[in-house]
Structures are given as C-alpha cells and as structure tokens.
Amino acid sequence: MMTASFKGIRISKPIVKEISSFGSLTNIDLHTDPYEKVEAKALSRSRLKNQSVKKTDLRITNDYSSLFVSIENKKNTIPDIHCNNLSKRPVGFTDSYVPGEALLCPDDPNLVNELFDDVLKRLREEKSDSGEQFHWDANVTLSQENKWSFITGYLSRNDKFLKISSNDSELNVKASVISYIEKLSCTPLKLKYVESLAVALRTESVTWVRYFLLMGGHIVLAKILQAIHEKKHLKSPDITLEIAILKSMRCIIGQKIGTDFYLSNKYPIDSVVHCLLSTKLLVRKLAAELLTFLCYSEKPNGINAIMKCMKNFANLKVESMNVFDLWLSQWKRTLLEKVVTEEKKVLEEAALHDKITIEYIISQMLLINAFLENIPSKTALLQFKESLRIGNFKSILLILKKINDEGVLKQLEKCVKLVSLDTANEKHFLKHTPNSAAHQSLLNTNMFNDANFEFMVKEHIKNFLKLLKEHNNPVRIIKLLDCLVLTLQADKGNGNSNNDIDCFYKELKIGNEQGNNAPGYSSVTSGYGTTNSKKVVASYDNTDDNEYSVSKSELYATGDTNNTTNQGYENSERKYVESSKYETDLKNIFDCLCLLFPSEFDPQSSFSAEKIFSKLKHLLTRTRDSYISEDTKILRLLNRSSSKLQDRDQEYLISKNNVNGNGNRDWVQPVNTTSSVSAFASPRIKPKLLFQPNQDEKLKLCKLDLAKANSITLKSEPSSAVSTHSFEVHLSMPGTQIKSANLAEKMETSKHKVFNPKRIDVVSDLPLDYRKSYYGRFSITDTKRFSKIENMRIKEVIDGNPFKAPPPAPLPPPAPPLPTAMSSLQKFEKNDSQIFRKTIIIPENISIDDIFKFCSGSESEVYASKIPGELCNPSKRLKQLHWKRLEVPFEKTLWNIVVADPYLLTLKLTAEGIFKQLEDCYPLREVTVSNKKVKEYTGFMPVDLQQMVSIRLHRFNSLTPIEIAKKFFHCDHDIMELVDFFNDRKFFRQEGLKKQLKPYMSSRNEEVMEVSEKLLELSRFDQIYTLIVVDIDTYYEKRMAALKIKSFLANNFRDFRRQIRKLHCASLELKSSLHFKYFLNLVLHIGNFMNDAPRRAKGYRLESLLRASMIKNDKTGLTLLHTIEKIVRTHFPQLEAFLVDLKAIPEISRFNLEQLEQDCNDICERMKNVEKDFSNEGIFSNHKALHPDDHICEVMVPWIPSGKSMVDELNSDITELKTTLKTTLLMYGENPDEPTSSARFFNNLNEIILEYKKASTVNQKMEKEEELAFLRLQALKASVKSNNAENSGSSKNEEVSATMENLISQLQKGLCDDSLSNKTDCTESSKQTIETLMNYENDKQTLEGSNKKRQTVVLKAECMLKQLENNNELKR
C-alpha cells in the first residue's frame, strides 16, 4: 500500500486558476511527474467526462487558517463535497474553471485520513511559529472528498509549480522557464546556459521573469553560486561561471519583483556577499554593484538584509577578525595590490591604462558610501566608522587620492564627509574604544548617558521624519513616537512613566480579552509648555468624550444587512478580524522597538505582548531614574523635537487633505497646534497606489508594502477591527468566499459605510461593483466614478439631515411585457424552443391533396399569418439563402397566387422532420468578436526604435536618464563608441516623435538648464530622447557630424594610409620588374609562332594571357598556359622570379582605388563643414544657443588643427598614388582615363598569377607521376629476369599450384632440354608478353606489382607446358 508520506505527493497542475483554491487534481496516482505521458492524460480526460463537478465545489478562501476558526456553534467551515450525487454540469459552467484534468479522490480511506492528519499537524506548526491561534474540532466528521479537496488545496499553495496561474496563453512562457531551470539543474553545468539565461532575463518580458522567480530560478542560481564557494580551489571555468551568475542576478534585481524576492530570501544575498572575498577582480566588482543597488532600492529592508549577511564574514577565515576589516582586507588583491605598492609614476600609468581597476575602486567606494548613508542602527554605523578609521582603509584612501579620476575623487570626498566626526560625543566615544567588543559593550551601557541622550533623540527623530517623508501613511509611526517621547521624559513632580506604559499595555490588551471590542489605542496629548505632562486616555468605550470615537451601535451594519447576514458567521468573522488586527499592530510595535533599541529587542526572537511591555517598562523605568537630576535640560530638548514633529504631522495631514481639487476624497480633522494628538485617532487615509512602469498588466497596481522592514509596516489601513468598514473590507477581499447562500443572494442591497468630514456615519445603498472598486479591486476609472457618487451622496446628507441616514433606494420596477406584434421576433434559447414545440399538436396523417387543394384566389399573407411563430422560425440561425428580387410587379407573377396551404405544408414538413434536418445540416456559425487587449502605455517612442535604443544603451541600464544625458554632453568615451548609432537617421529623424516630446523639453534659466517637471511622466526611453535630442534639436545633426568625423579619423586614418602606401609600392614594383617584362616577351614569341601572319602583333594587353588558359592540348588535355609554365621552368628558370616581384598583387587587388578616392573626398568635405561650423561665423560660435552642459566646443576646437593635417596628408598621398598608377597603366597598354581601369588591371593580373601557379602545380605533379611510372617499368623488367633465373633451378615450393608442380616435375626429368624449337617458341612467347606489358605501361594504366608478377609466371608456365607436350608427341 502506498505510504502516507507528505513529501511523496507530487501534483502536476491545479484545478482552478486561483492560487489558494480547493478542488480535485488530475493524475492517475499521486506519484506523478509534471511531464505526464499521453496515455495517462487521455485516460484522465475520459474519467473527467464521466465525473461532473459543481460550481460550488471550487472553494476560494483568503487564508487557510480561516477554515479552522472556532465559532460559537462549534462547527468547522469546510464545506462538504458530494461528488457522487452530481448528475450533470450546470448551465453556464465552462471549462475555464478547470484548465487541466481532475484527479479524483483515492479509494483508500486510510491514506486520505493519514494525509489529512499530516496537513493539520503542519498547519498547527505554521500558526504556532507565526504566533497565530489554530482551532480544530475533532468531533466533526468530514467526507473523504472534502478531506481530499482540502489536502490538494494545501499542496497547491505550498508547491512552487502550482502557485503559477495555469493560463493557456502562458504555457509557452512556462515551458521556456522550465527548460532553463532544468538546464541549470543538470550536472555538469555548462557556461552557455547561464550566459543565455542572462540574455533572456534582460530581453524577455516581466511575466517571464516573474515565472522564473516563482519557479525558484533565483534559488537555483544561489545554490550554484554557493556550491562554487564551497570548493577549496577554484579553476578558471568556475570563476567564469561565477561572473555569469552574478550578471544574471543583476538582471533579476533590476526589477522590483526581483528585488522583493531577494530581500525575502536570505541565502541569495549570502552568496552575493561571499563574492566580496573572491580572488577575481570582476567578481568583487559585480558583487559590490549588486549590494549597492539593494542598499538604495528598499530602505531599510535592503541594508538590514545585507547587515545580517555580513555577520557571517568573521566565520569564513579568522573568527577573531572584525567583520568589516575582513572585507576591507580584500582591497590589496590582484591588480589593486600592484597599484597600491608601486611608485607614483607607475601608479598614475596603471590608473590611466587599467579601466577595470578604476571601475572596481568606484564600485567598492559606492558600497562603502551606501553603508554610511543607509545603516539604520546607530551601533552598527559607529562600529563601521571605527573600522574605517583604525583599519587599513585609511592608508588606502591616501593612495587612492593620487589617482587622477573624477569618479574616484568624487566618491572619496563623499566618504570622507560621511566618516568625519561632527560631534564631540562621537570623538569621546571612539577615543576610548580600543576594539569592537569593547565598543559594543560600551555602547550598550552608555546608550542613555547624559551626554549622548540629546544626540540619540535627535537621530531617532531624524529617522522617524525620514520615514514620514518617504511613506504616505505614517500614523503608526507618529503614535509610537508620541508614546515613547511622553514616557521618556522624567517628570519629577506629577509624571509617572509606569502608569503611562501600563495604560498603553492595557489598551492593547483590551481587544484580546473582550470579544466584541477591538484593541484600542489611547490618544495621548502631551503639553510641553511646563514641566508637567498631561495625559488624555480615551478608549473606544468612552464615546461621549472622544470626538473620533465610534459608537457600539455603529460597529455592525444595520437595516437590511442584519436581515441578510447570518449572526454566527458575522461573529466569527469579526473575531477573526479583531485577532488579526491585534497581532498586526503588536508586530508593528515590536519592529519599531527593535529599530530603536537593538540591544534590548532581538528581531529574530519570538515576541508576545507580555514580553514586549515588560521589557519596555523596565527600560523606561531605568531611563527615568537616570534622568531625574537633568529633567529641565531634557524637557527643553523634548519640547523642541516634539514641536517639530507636531508641525510635521499637521503639515502632512493638511497636504493629504487636498488630494483632489474639491477636497472631497479624504477629510482630515486639522491637528490642534497646542497639543500633539495621536495620529491613530485621525481618519483613515487610503493607501496610495503606485504605478510600476516596468511591470506587466497584472502587477501595474500594487500597494506599498513594508512588511519586511524593521520599522512600522504600512501594508494595511489603520482601521478599527470591529467597524463595518473593516467588515466590508474583509468581505470584499479577492480570496474571501461568501459561505451563506442567503447572504450571496442579498449582497447587492448590503450597506456600505461612508465617512463625512464631521465623522458622521452614513449608510447608503451602493452597487456591489462600486463597493469593490472602492477597495482597489477594479480599474481606476471605476474608483473615480464611485468616489464622485459617494461625494454626491454625502453632500445630500449634509444639506438635509446630517444625523439621519437616508432610506434605502426602492427596487426597480419589473420590465413591461413585450407587445403582441413583437412576440414572433423574440429570440428563444434552444431549450425554450423545444418546450414551445411540444405544446403544438401536429396531425399524424396529412395528405398531399389537402395541401394543394387550396383556394387560389386568396393571397399568401393571409394564410401565412395562421402559422405559429414557433414553427416558421428555427431554433437557431441557419445559413441564409439570398433571393434575387423580382424585376416586375409582384401582382403579375405566379407568386401572387397561392397554390398550397402554407399552414398544412408547414405542419407536414415539421412532422416529417425536414425542418429538424435543415437545422442540423445548415447551422450558421456564430462569430464571436474577441475583445482586443488594450495596449499598455509604453511611451511615445515606436517599439522598433525602443528596441534599438535598449540594445545600444544596455551598458547604461544602471544610470538614470539625466546621468546618461550628462555623459552625452560631456562626450564621454562610452558615448564616442556609439557615434554611429547617434548619427543614424532612423534615430534622430523622428519628426513626429519630436513634436510629441516638445512640451517636455527642458527650459533654460540663464546658465542653467532646468529639467521640466513633466519629464518624469514619460517612460525611460522618452526621457533619454528628450534630453539628448529634443533639447538640442537645433544643432544636434551638426554636433554629431563633427563627432563622427573625429571618431572616424581616429579609428580609420592609419588604415587609409596603409592601403594607399601598399597600392603605391605595388605600382612601383610592377614598373621596375625586368623578369616580368622578359616573361611577357617570351609569351609574345610563342603566340606569334602559333598565330597566322595577319594575327601576329608587336604587343598585347595583360588580359590576353587569360586566353592561354583556354587553349587545350588534344592529347593530354592540358592548356597552353601549362606548356608555357613548363617551358619557363625548364629552359628559363630565372624568369620565375617575377612571382616574387609581384607578391603584393593578390592583396592590393582587393583594394578599390575609386572608392578610396571617393572616401577621401568625402572626408575633406566634412572636415571643411566642421571647420566652418566652429569658426567665428559658425553655429557653435554662439554659446548662448548651446546647451549649458555641452562640452562640444572644448572637445572639437583643440582637435580641428590635427584633423585638418590628417586630411591634408590623405590628399597628398592620393594625388601621388594617382600619378604613379597612371604611368603604370600607360606602360602596360591600359587606358588610365577609364573610371575602372586600375581595378580591372589589378584583378586581371591577380588572376594570371593564380592560374600560372595552378599550372605549375599540375605540371610538377604529372612529372612526378611519369618518373614513378618509369621506375615501375624498370622494376618490372628486373623481376622478369629474376623469375627466369628462379624457374631454371630445382627448388621445390609446396605452395605452388598444381600446374607449377607438374612443370617442376617435368623439368627435373630433363624433358625441356632436347628440342631447340620448343625453346625458341618459349622465347618468342616471352617476348610477346614483355611487349604487351610495355604497351600497357605506355598507355599510363596503373597495374599492381603483384598482379604483373603473377601474370608473368603464369604465361611462362603455359609456354613451358606447351614445350613439354610437344616433346612427348615427338618421342611417341
């Protein structure tokens, strides 16, 4: 039997598209692979057809824990699933709910029960770890289908492959991502896979990257990087692979979703931090860039995650070594070590020529400055500054200052400014801190000393104000700050910190002890005019004294809502919301305390209300006792800091009050300037929706989430847990399932709570879609429209009776019945038409005589009106038969007389099933018009131009558009490499784009160019185009033309001169070559000998030699050129030296003199235009018309004289070359005035030389073959002689054939020595054999030596046998 191991379950696809869905899954068994076989899928589909599913079986819930909330009736909220009782799928249920196959519940009940218990156990562990409560009533019995549905739902939430929506349009994207992950998982890993992944992450869509992250691709990269770091000795392929992985990570972190994944997962950052210790310079550079980006991207999440990872540095090599000293020790490795240890002259030379070293230094300095700017903890910041001062970094700074680089000097100045000591407190503190351990202990003990308290409070207030400025919902920060400031002041007379903390703790504990009240927070009002502090503690129970309190009668919806909702369900949901809000608020306070007091509160430890407030009470009591003597000085400081905070709070709330022009969106009560009212009592402010430009449509709207930060979280509204507003928010969540059927039917008439400026609760009837759009589930247009309707309703209430809710809107009247004349035009569904047809009685026997015995004098319309509409109209639309209209009056045609009864004919056709047959055979296909997807806003720039710009400027992805424009105007080296791209007419000749971007161009204010505020509304590519093209459209083309001629001459001047010189030298060698002249004279004599008298000439052009390769020898098949080559090599070998004289001809034949001359003329013309533009009368002479940051004049004006001299040199070389070529062509009989004469001359000469060399190769090869043939003939003759000598002996050979044995036996008897005539015959036959073989060799037919010898021996034996036979006949 299959074991119930939870890890053994593998599910391929979810049943519904939502992530948190309950339902069955589709596989034959549990142990299936994502890549299932076709047979298994086909079987699953066949089983799915037999199994029907209800719409209510697909349960959608917001959180799994909500299924186990214990309610008053002690019943669990998991719905029962009765699959066996389902007969058919209801109407309207489509396959879009079930994208894959469906896996039925296993037949083994023990397996289901064991798995269900395992899931419950895991849920208890998860909820206990997160501090949440978990309830399950074991007395309730669930069906096996219900348990299996819950198991599969839990798996679909925790499986990384099932979290992805199974949309059919995204299957290709998923397959591509899975293929990449499989390639990364295989061993050994190939470098090309990681490099192609980096390209895909940079070029593919955001959806592709999101799927890659959801499937754990970033985890695979981190594990590969971790495996590389675990090796003791790294090889070159490992380092190259490490660089490719870091580049892929850089592409992931460049997007917001990638940054969130890396901050939520710890070990990917650990691997990146470990790369700072690499021996490869480029690896450390990439790692520093990634960490710098994380420091600035998510504050303070990024820096906190990096600081946690930096703690592992000390355990890598030396445990006693300081964390930051270990990192700073990497600065003297590889190339940087050479730069630091050499002398000044060598240092400057290395800094100028080694670009990677400069970039590495800048990256490390950027990371150091990022730490100095973003470390939130004062302890860690002081420790880091101390490490910079006492470590090796100070000596490195002194040497780095000698490097003449603008970027390095800028970062050094910033670093020195951040590290410099501003207060005497830090000097005293660092002076007496010999090491990091003592530093930590001293910091913990002296955190609340008299000298440091003022500095500490200033720093904390500065951090809080920074958070207040960056985020749009700082009410929780303000509340906690008010409470801390109030309790930290030690009131000698009337103040009591213990009472403040006790009240605060009591208010937080109210919601947990009482079921119908939420955790209330007191609003604390502090008066700083005197030394006494006044506290105003008002809970939600005290509704008469608190202006912002909510009455208990308003906690629940009234009217129709109480009639439509179930009381038990409402109580359970309210309790769940109260507990979740209490836990969220408690977690927020704990995070803030960890940020304020890191020595007392550990972020990684578990927390509870009793533990938090016991520590806080102890801390504040100790603080109060140490400051009783200095209460006057502290209170003065607190008065000053709190007043600033109070002003800031009021300014923020007033600015939020005017979100819209009419001020009706959010109303905020102004804060009293004489007291610091807690922001928890202020009205709710809806979270701001942030538009992400690089996100796809699914990720376009997202709320600001700081849940992972060590500060106050802002992921939800600070609304009351027991208000109807929170109740409606919970009901309108995307994952919340309405479990009451009565509630689902009456939801359209439920009430929604609206807040007016006077805090009057108004109950009004609003449609459900408006209420959903109010919470951000739908489009912004729906939200604005609902806001407008809401404001109108509020205005009506204020103008009328503000204390009385208007009555609910009446139900709309029923629709009026259709007229009788239109009843036949009404469209019926298929089922409805079948019902109507059953009510019509059709006679069984209708004769043809009854149909055609008809009154011919009646008109057809009268009888056609008798036919019911149910019979003459088909149940669905059929293919149309288009009639041709009559061209004569209808009365004159046969159609005017009715020859058959239409009614009986219709009944007959219906009874025979003819109409039914027509409906089945000729249905009309319904054409559904698909809704065109609205294209996302990608900017004004065309898509093809965006792709071109993104490819060309990919190296500047880390820079902002303003920084790119700065490089452009400063003529940076990287920009000069892209001059050809900026000169492309497809780039800057976009008149329509310029016209659209003209309103966003910058404006000039004296000597400063002010960027337009509207520029931020554009996309990144439009911003770049506006800054570098539209702003200088008047002189952009001439500016880039000047830079192009400068770049062209710098890169191609030497190549031009080298080509010209080679042409010149080759021409001179051709003129002075005597061997070539003698060779041409020899060919002339040979040709005149072959030609007839009229065809003989005194000279010829070189093109005539090509004719020699076309005249062939009839015997050998060779050409005349082969004969000429053999004559020269045999009889005139000294003439072959002309090949050495003309060795440069093959190379210069590829040069085009005409093209070189045209390019030089073009360069001269462009140089004249540049010189004219930069003259006193040119366009660049007016500096006011230029961009203030443009350095084109500083770059081009000093270069123009050198550029002009280079152009003059090219002109002189071209002139001299033309003169030499002209004389050379005249010498060899060519016309130099023709445009292409020189190119044709050198091409023909090159072809002659190549053909001559081929002929020489062929001739030499044939001569070697003839020599070998002659040697073979000599060897054959010698073998014949040796065979004759061997045959005259008496030796025996057992391996000889039977013929040879007979011959040898006859020879031993002496039968061959009596007759001379027989010897003569043998000799003659031998001669004939030898002549035959010689003729065979003369015909140049190759024969093997063994075959020749075998044939010779056989012939010899035959002759001798013939002699023996003759001798025997003579004896007889």
From Swiss-Prot:
Taxonomic placement: Eukaryota, Fungi, Dikarya, Ascomycota, Taphrinomycotina
Organism: Schizosaccharomyces pombe (strain 972 / ATCC 24843) (Fission yeast)
GO molecular function: actin filament binding; SH3 domain binding; small GTPase binding
Record bears the keyword Cytoplasm: yes
Compartments, as annotated in UniProt: Cytoplasm
Boundaries of every GBD/FH3 domain copy: 104-522
Record InterPro entries: Actin_filament_regulator, ARM-like, ARM-type_fold, FH2_Formin, FH2_Formin_sf, GBD/FH3_dom, GTPase-bd
Domain of life the protein comes from: Eukaryota
Protein name from the UniProt record: Cell fusion protein fus1
